[in-house]
Amino acid sequence: MASRKVVYRRPLAIDDVTSHSEAISAYSLESAFRFLDALESTLDLLSRFPEAGGVIPVRRKELEGIRAKLVVGFSHFIILYCVEENHIEILRVIRGGQDLHSVSLNAR
């Protein structure tokens, strides 16, 4: 069995998750907890199967090699990440429908 990769979250990704969970909790606290659980389950899946997400077709050089994976059970949220030799780096967690080429990947 392949070893798990460590999952690192960039500050922007942490901010994204906070923002999304707060927005969801305004309608349903239970749904917000389900979102957080689903996100963690998806990150666990990526730690075991890093290539589970598809490579994004790009127009911007800085996006080359970045993968996207839908949050299981919350398919309108997308995890943007890159696979490194010993870890996975979570760059952003965005809402579906956002133009991927306009999403900032720079640290806050």
Regions found by a protein language model. Name each.
Residues 1-38, 42:
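Arg/Lys-rich, positively charged N-terminal/basic patches that mediate binding to nucleic acids
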Residues 33, 54-58, 102:
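Short, hydrophobic secondary-structure boundary micro-motifs
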Residues 20, 49, 103-106:
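Residue-level signal for well-ordered alpha-helical positions
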Residues 71-108:
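Enriched for short, Lys/Arg-rich terminal
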